Regions:
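C-terminal helical cap(s) of enzyme catalytic domains, especially alpha/beta-barrels
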Residues: 178-205
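Conserved, mostly hydrophobic/aromatic
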Residues: 1, 52, 88, 123, ...
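Short acidic, Gly/Ser-rich segments with clustered Asp/Glu that frequently serve as metal-coordination loops
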Residues: 84-86, 90-95
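Alpha-helix N-cap and loop-to-helix initiation/capping positions
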Residues: 25-36, 62-73, 102-107, 139-150, ...
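Active-site acidic/histidine proton-transfer and metal-coordination neighborhood
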Residues: 2-85
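Conserved active-site loop/cleft motifs that coordinate metal ions or position small ligands
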Residues: 166-172
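Active-site-proximal loop/turn and secondary-structure-junction residues that shape catalytic pockets
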Residues: 5-9, 58-60, 91-93, 127-131, ...
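Gly/Pro-rich active-site loop or hairpin
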Residues: 31-34, 95-162
Length: 229
């Protein structure tokens, strides 16, 4: 069970009837928002008697009063409530592109590096589209195409950094032939396998304990014909 870190209902003006936005609206990354979201997540978990996942969204607007880094916000949410995080890699790239990041892949990778690996329970991938108008180009998380190259790059980095995670390729509109869907799933498998193989030596070098040294007088002896090979 999972849901997005967002809100969808709000009054247009103070005192007016609450309306539904029919979209995922971004929350402010502040202490107040963290308190509200933590309370709501805990209420759902108490009702369901299980931890739930909370997903980062693609945000086309931001809040001027943000005071917390997004990754830090999610880390603290997970620490407070025991929820797990659903990391949407496509949303990271979409947000970086719309923010005008000089290097969108590096910006998305920085989020991955800041998130606690133990909190991440699942990863999402998807395609995006670009819409150009009078005011410029907007990147839309529309789940209507193949996964783009920058998203694959960040996914490989995420697997190397976070370890193997269940991964879902989302494709909701303009559905292609089934073979193409399977191809995207295979690509995710291959990239994950390659990333884990590259990461494994680094992890082993960092984590492997030094061989224990046994004083000569304490070394075990074995009957003839028995021993360690």
């Amino acid at each position: 069970v999972s849901d997005h870190a967002c809100f969808a209902r709000a009054p247009l003006r103070a005192g007016q009837t609450t309306v539904h936005a029919s979209d995922l609206l971004p929350i402010a990354f502040t202490r107040e928002s963290l308190n509200i979201l933590s309370r709501n997540v805990q209420r759902v978990q108490d009702k369901l008697a299980r931890p739930i996942g909370v997903e980062n969204i693609s945000a086309y607007l931001g809040w001027a009063d943000d005071t917390l880094a997004e990754a830090g916000f999610f880390n603290e949410l997970a620490e407070r409530t025991g929820c797990w995080l659903l990391l949407d890699v496509n949303n990271l790239v979409v947000n970086a592109l719309n923010a005008g990041a000089a290097d969108p892949v590096a910006a998305a990778n920085a989020f991955v590096d800041a998130i606690e690996a133990r909190h991440v329970g699942e990863i999402h991938l998807a395609g995006y589209s670009e819409k150009t108008g009078e005011t410029g180009t907007l990147v839309i998380d529309d789940h209507g195409s193949r996964v783009h190259a920058p998203v694959w790059q960040v996914y490989a980095h995420a697997i190397a950094r976070l370890g193997a995670k269940p991964t879902l390729v989302e494709w909701d509109t303009a559905l292609p032939a089934f073979d193409m869907l399977l191809g995207e799933a295979r690509e995710a498998d291959l990239l994950a396998q390659a990333a884990l193989e590259v990461a494994a030596p680094r992890v082993e070098r960092r984590a492997a304990p030094k061989p224990a040294r046994i004083p000569s007088g304490d070394r075990p002896t074995y009957p003839s014909g028995e021993g360690l090979t």
